[in-house]
């Protein structure tokens, strides 16, 4: 069984882009993440260890977006996908 968790509208300030101004001035990035997971065990046990910690996912995405700059948004998205 698969469940889907949506974390939508996460806003972070980052310095990504191919243009010098994007890296110098930065901008707001709005990130949506969709996680496909099996939460069957969490539903049975009521134990937080059996689920996804939304706060940790948020912090992981925040650290990536607010971290070292990327020229391409595609590269930034790949870094997020690999981490979560």
UniProtKB/Swiss-Prot annotation:
Pathway: Cofactor biosynthesis; tetrahydrofolate biosynthesis; 2-amino-4-hydroxy-6-hydroxymethyl-7,8-dihydropteridine diphosphate from 7,8-dihydroneopterin triphosphate: step 3/4. The keyword Lyase applies. GO terms for biological process: folic acid biosynthetic process; tetrahydrofolate biosynthetic process. GO terms for molecular function: dihydroneopterin aldolase activity; isomerase activity. It catalyses: 7,8-dihydroneopterin = 6-hydroxymethyl-7,8-dihydropterin + glycolaldehyde; 7,8-dihydroneopterin = 7,8-dihydromonapterin. SMART domains: FolB. Pfam families: FolB. Substrate binds at residues 22, 54, 73-74. GO terms for cellular component: cytoplasm. The keyword Isomerase applies. SUPFAM superfamilies: Tetrahydrobiopterin biosynthesis enzymes-like (SSF55620). Its EC number is 4.1.2.25, 5.1.99.8. Keywords: Folate biosynthesis, Isomerase, Lyase. Belongs to the DHNA family. Catalyzes the conversion of 7,8-dihydroneopterin to 6-hydroxymethyl-7,8-dihydropterin. Can also catalyze the epimerization of carbon 2' of dihydroneopterin to dihydromonapterin. This is Dihydroneopterin aldolase. It comes from Staphylococcus haemolyticus.
């Amino acid at each position: 069984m698969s469940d889907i968790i949506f974390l939508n509208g996460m806003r972070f300030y980052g310095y990504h882009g191919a243009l010098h101004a994007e890296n110098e001035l930065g901008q707001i990035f709005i990130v949506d993440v969709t996680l496909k997971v099996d939460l069957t065990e969490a539903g049975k046990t009521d134990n937080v260890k059996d689920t996804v910690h939304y706060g940790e996912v948020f912090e992981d995405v925040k650290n990536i977006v607010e971290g070292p700059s990327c020229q391409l948004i595609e590269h930034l998205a790949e870094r997020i996908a690999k981490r979560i």
